[in-house]
Every structure is written in C-alpha cells, then in structure tokens.
Swiss-Prot record:
The gene is tig. It is an enzyme of class 5 (isomerase). Its EC number is 5.2.1.8. It comes from Acinetobacter baylyi (strain ATCC 33305 / BD413 / ADP1). This is Trigger factor. Involved in protein export. Acts as a chaperone by maintaining the newly synthesized protein in an open conformation. Functions as a peptidyl-prolyl cis-trans isomerase. One of its GO terms (biological process) is chaperone-mediated protein folding.
C-alpha cells in the first residue's frame, strides 16, 4: 500500500491511497469460496454450487463488499502509517481502479498544532472586592425579605407593595387572549409586566378603578401584539405592604444560631459566606478574563468534528437542566429541534479553541495538578456544609468527583501561569457589581 499526504488546511489532511489489486483479488476469491459453501441456488444442493455459478450470480456484489471493507481498513492503516492525529471519521472521495491498483482519496480532520503567543502580550483585568458592614446588613435584610409577610393597608400602592387586582385589556378596541385576569397578585417594581403597566397602578387604593395606556414592546413574544398600543382597565381589590420578620430567637434558629450568640453571630456567619462568594467570584472573573485574552490573542482553526461534539455536549447539558427544572414529563415533550446547532455554534467554537490552547499551555509549561491545592479547594467548598468532614471524605474518596475538582484546580494553575507574565490591571468593584457580573457570565 502506498500513501501520500497533503495539507488541505491547518486542521485537514488529504491522503492519496493506492492498494494493490492483488490484495483485493485475494480477499475476493476467499470470500467467493466461503459464499459457495452456503449459497442456495435452485437445482444445486447446498455446498455443491459450482464456483463459476457463484461468481456470475454473486460476484459483483461480493467484489463491492470487499472493496468497501478494504477501503475501511486501509484508510485507518494509512492514518496510522502517516502518524496523523485524526479527529472524527475520514471522508472517502474519488474511488478509482487504475492499472493494478485501487486508488482513492480520503480527507480527515486533524488535531490543531498551535504555538501560543507570549503571555506578556496579553492584557487582563483582575477585579478586587471587599465586604463591608453595609454589604452584610443588606444581605441580612435580603434574608428577612425572603421570609417577609404581607399586611393589608388602606393607603396608596407604592413600589415594593403587593397589589391584588382585576384587569381587562383591549387593543384597537378588541379584547385579546391573555389580556384579562381576576385576583391577579403583583409586587410593584418586580418588572413582571410590560413597561408602564406597574407605574400605572402606583398611587391607586383598594376599591379604585382606572384605565391605563401602555404600549407592548416591539420584541414582545406575541407577534400580534408587538408594538401595539393597549388600554387596560384596572380594578384594585387589595393593597399590602411588606412586613419583615424581627431578628429574634425564632429567626436566628432558622440559621442554626442560638439566642445567646445573637445577631453578632449571624453577622459573622453571613460575612464568612459572602467572603467565600467573593473569593469564588473573583477567581471566576479573572479566569474568564485570562482565557478570553488567550483566545483573542491566538487565532486558530479547529476541526468541525470537535465543534460538533461540543455542540452536542452543550445541547445535552441544556436538556439535563431542563429536565431538572421541569421534571421527566416536561423533558419528554421537549423537542431537540428547538435547540438547533446554530444556537450553540459560537460558544462551542470558542470552547474548543480554549481547550486546544489550554492543553498546549499545560504541555509547554509541564504543569501537573497540585494536590495540595485540590485539598484546599475541597476544604473550602466543604466549609459551607453542615458537616464539612463528611463532605471532605466524600470528595477525597470518590475518584470521579475528585477528578472533576482536579480539572478545575489545573485550570486555576494555568490562569496563574498566564497572569505571572501578562499585563494585569487591578479594578475595585462593589460586592453587588461583582455578583451582577457573575450572573451575567452564567447567563451567556
């Protein structure tokens, strides 16, 4: 077998393969004889059919089977012979019989060979944040709001109050589907309704009626309403103001704090949790910034097969999240066509490029996972649980779980390696801004 290779692109190779006809004929004759032993043809006993009859009746089909099998076998022999780091399945083209050989072309994608640019050309922004007393007080107030109750008031509806009301909507003088409801509850300022709707209710009291004018957004989900002006008749039935629970013994007990330890212990625990959130948020921020800079500075081609695999992985991940959120019944009604490749392609390409570059950085720097950092990571993660020792034992003894953490820590080591040489600028941010940025990254 003769093989020549040419580069089609940075991630594709074309192999020209020539297989001697003698190899085909040898396998063809052997398979023809095996077929003769079992062939069933009228007028002949099993196993007694002349080889010439088997050749005339079955020969063309058997010959094509042999050719297909030889191409399948030899293409992988050729890839191995040429020491090609193939990705995905080869594509067979131009199969021909020339002189005493079977000749064909095969195109195969290959793992990219890249050279990473020097890190001192990278510019990375590293955020910094501190927890202050106001942040802690605001977090405790949020904990109170999560357990707030409602008290009826005769006063005017204001932002953050809950209003119970009926509404009837019209567009061009006609009622429309979903445009009316009774005993509808809405916290003013929540942003649940279209722009202007909640503002129109502010200032109303129980028992009052009012017609408000609003306009549906141009990108409204119901196309027949998008951009349309509408009138809504509002009848307020009840207005309630929020009532926060007192920080008393009962409230403290929810968080495992005794009355003796009091609010100071609550503040200390809340601060500790917030500081852990900040550390994680800052680590994720600088990791994302470093990796974004790495990808932006190194323009590389990646095989479509790797991108396709990443698209499938991201799609399956989204379906799993959908299943967890809506249950098995909801997942069964979920159609994968609702998640086309285009939805994931851009992010998948970026993810594959990053994976290739990180692998190259690991190889060039000869980085190996720091087991001490893995243990520290596990200890810190376990500290947020009721029984940290049990969690530590679980992650340290479960090989699969530990391997996942090792992968995260190894990424952190790559980031540290990049930052040691990159141009890093420090930026102070507030706790709230840091969380908003983190939520925005997760939503992408």
């Amino acid at each position: 077998m003769q093989v020549t290779t040419e580069a089609v692109s940075g991630v594709a190779r074309r192999l020209n393969v020539s297989v001697p006809t003698s190899r085909i004929n040898e396998q063809f004759e052997a398979r023809l004889k095996r077929t003769a032993k079992t062939a069933k043809i009228n007028g002949f006993r099993p196993g007694k059919v002349p080889l010439s009859r088997v050749r005339s009746d079955f020969g063309p089909g058997i010959y094509q089977e042999v050719v297909n099998d030889i191409i399948r076998d030899t293409v992988f022999e050729a890839i191995q012979q040429e020491k090609i780091n193939a990705v995905g399945m080869p594509n067979i083209e131009k199969v021909e019989h020339k002189d005493d050989a079977l000749v064909y072309e095969a195109t195969v994608e290959v793992y990219p060979e890249v050279e990473v640019k020097a890190f001192d050309t990278l510019e990375v922004e590293r955020k910094a944040a501190e927890i202050n007393d106001k942040d802690v007080d605001a977090m405790i107030e949020n904990l109170q709001k999560q357990r707030q109750t409602w008290a009826v008031t005769k006063g005017m509806a204001k932002k953050d109050m809950q209003v119970t009301f009926d509404f009837e909507g019209e567009v061009d003088g006609e009622k429309f589907e979903g445009g009316s409801a009774e005993d509808f509850k809405l916290v003013l300022g929540s942003g649940r309704m279209i722009p202007g709707f909640e503002d129109g209710i502010i200032g109303m009291k129980a028992g009052e009626e009012k017609v408000i004018d609003v306009t549906f957004p141009e990108d409204y989900q119901a196309a027949n309403l998008a951009g349309k002006a509408a009138k809504f008749k509002i009848t307020v039935k009840q207005v309630e103001k929020p009532k926060l629970p007192e920080i008393d013994a009962e409230f403290l007990k929810i968080f495992g704090i005794s009355e003796e330890d009091g609010v100071e212990k609550l503040k200390a625990d809340v601060r500790k949790n917030m500081e852990r959130e900040v550390r994680n948020g800052l680590r994720n921020q600088v990791k994302q910034a470093a990796f974004d800079a790495l990808v932006a500075a190194n323009e590389i081609d990646v095989p479509s097969a790797m991108v396709a695999q990443e698209i499938d992985r991201q799609r399956e991940q989204m379906i799993q999240q959908f299943t967890q959120q809506f249950g098995g019944a909801g997942a069964q009604s979920f159609d994968k066509s609702m998640l086309p490749d285009e939805l994931f392609k851009e992010q998948a390409e970026k993810s594959v490029k990053l994976g290739v570059l990180v692998s190259k950085v690991l190889a060039d720097a000869k980085l190996e996972v720091d087991q001490a950092r893995v243990d520290t990571y596990i200890d810190e993660m376990a500290s947020s649980y009721e029984d940290p020792t049990e969690v530590v034992d679980y992650f340290k003894n479960d090989k699969q779980q530990r391997a996942q953490i090792e992968a995260v820590v190894l990424e952190d080591q790559v980031v540290d390696h990049i930052l040691a040489a990159a141009k890093v600028t420090e930026t102070e941010v507030s706790y709230d801004d840091l969380l908003k940025e983190q939520q925005a990254r997760q939503a992408r």
